[in-house]
From Swiss-Prot:
This is Translation initiation factor IF-2. HAMAP family: IF_2_B. One of the essential components for the initiation of protein synthesis. Protects formylmethionyl-tRNA from spontaneous hydrolysis and promotes its binding to the 30S ribosomal subunits. Also involved in the hydrolysis of GTP during the formation of the 70S ribosomal complex. It comes from Chromobacterium violaceum (strain ATCC 12472 / DSM 30191 / JCM 1249 / CCUG 213 / NBRC 12614 / NCIMB 9131 / NCTC 9757 / MK). Residues 473-480 are annotated as: G1. GO terms for molecular function: GTP binding; GTPase activity; translation initiation factor activity.
């Protein structure tokens, strides 16, 4: 029998060992530590306890599975075996569901309780023939009263949810969900209260108007009997009103009369109704029930009596034409049914205000002229707008039709489609235009997701941590030698050759504490890290050679440290060499506002020798002293946060990232998010390549398991939810891709006219593959700085890892050069490159790559043309030959003259003509050149105006290669 311990079983069940121990104790299994073993009996006992606690029950069904095999013959004579599987579930009859069946009927009397109380009131109902009241009247009434009721109903349904998911969600998450539901319920209740208050205010205002001007409804009795007859003939409805009780508002029976039904004699005090059964006006009394919903008769809002009384026309003759039907629907328009609401169109009354009424549409317009309109104020939504959103998604968030959003955008001058993507700024303007509240959503901010667990992390006690030190300085000032000596002196003997295991950061144990040294790829990477606001470096050690002094890169390092507001410790190296002048270095550093403590400043100066090992302990002591002043602290028992120092692509292990933990503890199995890369930590190693399970603050580690190679200097953090990490990473990748494409498009548009004006720019396309991410970044930046107005370097692709066949194919398509920095091409890539003639160059030093690319760009520059004077010729005799022209007999007085040279004719020190030679002869022979002191005969091309004494200057145009 295989035994497992509590810790292993907890990891299988996705529980913490402490939680599993609590459940085991509650089940009666005595286990004290996560290392205790668990038997099958213990697991069975725990399972029985969990079933009892969660209310498990026996299966009430039997599953029958039937399988049959048959063969089907095809046309070609072959057979195909067909297997048919049938599955049937037989449910065992159970008494429990029958007993529980009547329970859902209990809430039913609740909504009917209100009408039940009003049953004694409508007893005099048979005396009154309320024929104008259509039967659909009870339908709108429950709609108004039932609107708020379904909203509280989900609350009891949500009660059992914590019991069913208690084993999955923590109590804090359940409490957060319940708080969110309460907040939503309060928000809905507040909106309903505001709407009711608005309706009541409108009704009170309308009631005041009705009370001020209340005409006598005299024409009503004349019209109503005929309407009664027509309605009865049309509907065939019984004369009695069998609609049942109206509610608990203590209204008395209605008097006879279909149109003007008069005041209710009950205690309703609502004043007289206006004429017209189909379109009943508002209740002028104190009945604050809100507007009637459009029912079967499409009665809509009740108009004011002042408008209703004059609008009654004389009764039409039985056989005569009805008003409003003289033309073929001539009175109808698009606005006919707008004022009566958008209810269901059914057969209405004859009062002239229904869509099928016989009174014509003209009266309908008069009736509704001063009618009370139902409040149409929309519910204000709080819309979270991401960085990009489509028109359809934006309309869905505002609970409106997409057509309305498109109309709003058209008013703003934008012609869009329903699937067009809007940017965040435009979407926020649209939301505000449509009367809603727009807020910019921070969907890609992990801090917003971690706000839920802030209550846990705030209480974590911060503990002192070791300092993170960056060593900076000029190239040849002994920075690397100093780091090597510190590792050799303070690390175990077996790690003496640990420089080859370079991961960019390592920590050193000293008698007074631990120090983490950070070796950034260069100053630019250091600035980029500081610009992101990540406090990766606590102290900067500035290395200055005593025999060389302050150099440009030293000054640059000082500026970086001051911009980041990081304290400095100056290490004056090479003090054992002759010619070392420490005092001169102090004076030069003071000129750059780095004042030593001896001179009243705040910067420690330590004189060291990396070669001899002098004062190395004093340097470490100064670093730890500065760290004590800073009081560096960080939480330990929380999710880890850190920064990516370096990243590379390992052929066997995939993406490998060097992570410097800044706060919290990173454990094996945590989900890490770094920019657009995410993944679960499959393995962790320290700087010596040893596998570790956890790393605390200020500890550098190599992690494996990320989905892609992250950017150097990117912030990294551990998340509790892998799904959320994937969502954020994919969102960032899509956003970065959109931004990159937008930038490229903008650059094309901006540079289009400039390139057309300046002519075509020569472009050198390059593909860079490097060993680590920092290397190709530095190389790409250095090469792009070589671009000028005439030649340009285009980095088509850059990445980490070896040169693959896909890289060579890209180079073939784009006619690019492939540069491998500390990498090599595989066999397939080499063979393809040889066959296609792709140039692959390998470099180990960045300066060699920059120099060769610079030389290639220089060759692409247009050569510079210069004029080189060859010699001077004096014309001593002019011979005229018919059909040939003038021939000059000359003497070469200086230099030489060539047959291919250009000629400049000078007369009286003035240039008369510039051209070419047509022929050059010495005696009767054609010659290519004539040197100084010899005579020759020559003839100019297309020019005969030559005289004795003229000077001829021979010159040629020479192209001189340019360089960057």
């Amino acid at each position: 029998m295989v035994l497992t311990n509590v810790k292993q079983f907890a990891s299988e069940m996705n529980l913490t060992p402490e939680r599993l121990l609590e459940q085991l104790r509650a089940a009666g299994v005595s286990k004290r530590s996560p290392e205790d073993s668990l038997s099958a009996q213990d697991k069975s006992q725990l399972l029985d306890y969990l079933k009892r606690s969660h209310g498990a029950r026996e299966d009430s069904g039997i599953t029958l599975t039937r399988k049959s095999t048959s063969e089907v013959k095809k046309a070609d004579g072959s057979t195909v075996t067909v297997e048919t599987r049938k599955k049937r579930v037989v449910v065992r009859p159970d008494d429990a569901p029958r007993a529980e069946a009547p329970k859902p009927a209990e809430p039913a009397p609740a909504p009917a309780a209100a009408p039940a109380e009003a049953k004694p009131e409508p007893k005099p109902e048979p005396k009154v023939e309320a024929k104008p009241e259509p039967k659909p009247e009870p339908k709108p009434e429950p709609k108004v009263e039932a609107k708020p009721e379904p909203k509280p109903e989900p609350k009891p349904a949500a009660a059992p949810a914590p019991r069913t998911v208690a084993s999955i969600l923590s109590p804090e998450e359940i409490a957060a969900r319940e708080a969110e539901e309460k907040r939503q319920a309060a928000f809905r209740a507040r909106q309903e209260a505001l709407m009711r208050e608005k309706i009541e205010r409108e009704e009170r205002r309308q009631a005041a108007k009705l009370a001020a001007s209340q005409p006598a409804p005299e024409p009503a009795p004349v019209v109503e009997p005929q309407r009664e007859e027509r309605r009865d003939d049309r509907r065939g409805a019984p004369s009695g009103d069998n609609r049942g009780p109206r509610g608990n508002d203590n209204r008395g029976p209605r008097p006879a009369g279909a149109g003007d039904r008069g005041p209710r004699p009950g205690g309703d005090n609502r004043g007289p109704r206006p004429a017209g059964a189909g379109d009943r006006g508002p209740r002028p009394g104190g009945d604050n029930r809100g507007p009637r919903p459009a029912g079967a008769g499409d009665r809509g809002p009740r108009p004011a009596p002042a408008a209703a009384a004059p609008s009654q026309p004389p009764a039409p003759a039985p056989g005569g034409s009805r008003p409003g039907k003289g033309k073929k629907g001539g009175e109808r328009s698009w606005d006919d049914n707008k004022k009566g609401g958008r209810g269901l169109k059914t057969k209405g009354g004859d009062a002239g205000n229904d869509w099928k009424s016989r009174g014509g549409k003209g009266r309908n317009k008069q009736n509704n002229q001063h009618a009370f309109q139902a409040p149409t104020e929309p519910i204000v939504h709080e819309v979270l707008v991401p960085e990009t959103i489509t028109v359809a998604e934006l309309a869905h968030k505002m609970a409106v039709k997409a057509v309305e959003v498109i109309k709003t955008l058209m008013k703003m001058g934008m012609m869009v489609t329903i699937n067009q993507v809007l940017d965040q700024e435009t979407a926020l303007i649209v939301v505000e235009e449509m009367g809603h509240i727009g807020k910019a959503a921070q969907a890609d901010d992990p801090e917003a997701y971690l706000d839920v667990t802030d209550g846990e992390t705030v209480e974590v006690v911060e503990q002192p941590r070791s300092p993170v030190v960056t060593v900076m300085g000029h190239v040849d000032h002994g920075k690397t030698s100093l780091l090597d000596y510190i590792r050799r002196a303070k690390v175990a003997a077996g790690e003496a050759g640990g420089i080859t295991q370079h991961i960019g950061a390592y920590h050193v144990e000293t008698p007074r504490g631990m120090i983490t040294f950070l070796d950034t790829p260069g100053h630019e990477a250091f600035t980029a890290m500081r610009a992101r606001g990540a406090k990766a470096t606590d102290i900067v050690v500035l290395v200055v050679a005593a025999d060389d002094g302050v150099m440009p890169q030293t000054i640059e390092a000082i500026h970086h440290a001051k911009a980041a507001k990081v304290p400095m410790v100056v290490a004056v190296n090479k003090i054992d060499k002759q010619g070392a002048n420490v005092e001169r270095i102090r004076q030069e550093l003071v000129a750059h506002e780095v004042v030593p403590e001896d001179w009243g400043g705040d910067t420690q100066f330590v004189e060291v020798s990396a070669k001899m090992g002098l004062n190395i302990d004093a340097l470490l002591e100064a670093i730890l002293l500065q760290a004590e002043v800073l009081e560096l602290k960080a939480p330990v028992d929380s999710l880890a946060k850190g920064i990516i120092v370096e990243a590379r692509l390992d052929k066997g292990r995939g993406p490998v990232a060097t992570l410097l933990v800044q706060s919290g503890t990173l454990k094996k199995g945590d989900v890490v998010l770094a920019g657009t890369a995410f993944g679960r930590v499959r393995a962790m190693m320290d700087e010596n390549g040893k596998a570790i399970d956890s790393a605390g603050p200020a500890i550098p580690v190599e992690i494996l398991g990320l989905s892609d190679v992250p950017q150097a200097g990117e912030d990294a953090m551990a998340l509790a939810d892998e799904k959320k990490a994937r969502e954020i990473a994919l969102f960032r990748a899509g956003k970065f891709r959109d931004v990159r494409l937008a930038k490229q498009q903008a650059a094309k548009l901006e540079n289009m006219f400039a390139q057309m004006a300046e002519g075509e720019v020569q472009t050198l396309s390059i593909i860079i593959k490097a060993d680590v991410q920092g290397s190709y970044e530095a190389l790409a930046g250095s090469l792009q700085k070589l671009s000028t107005e005439e030649v340009r370097v285009a980095i088509l692709h850059s990445g980490v890892g070896g040169i693959s066949e896909s890289d060579v194919n890209l180079a073939i398509a784009s006619k690019a050069i492939v540069i491998g920095f500390n990498t090599r091409a595989d066999a397939a890539a080499r063979k393809l490159a040889e066959n296609e003639g792709v140039d692959i160059r390998y470099y180990n030093i960045i300066y060699d790559a920059v120099d060769e690319v610079k030389a290639a760009l220089s060759g692409m520059l247009a050569p510079e043309k210069k004029e080189q004077i060859l010699g001077t010729v004096e014309i001593r005799q002019v011979i005229t030959v018919s059909k040939v022209g003038n021939i000059a007999g000359c003497m070469v007085t200086d230099g030489m003259i060539k047959r291919s040279a250009s000629i400049r004719l000078i007369r009286n020190h003035v240039v008369i003509h510039t051209g070419e030679l047509e022929s050059l002869k010495r005696f009767k022979d054609d010659v290519k050149e004539v040197k100084q002191g010899y005579e020759c005969g020559l003839m100019l091309k297309n020019f005969n105006d030559i005289q004795e004494g003229d000077q001829l200057e021979a010159f040629e145009i020479v192209e001189v290669a340019r360089s960057l």
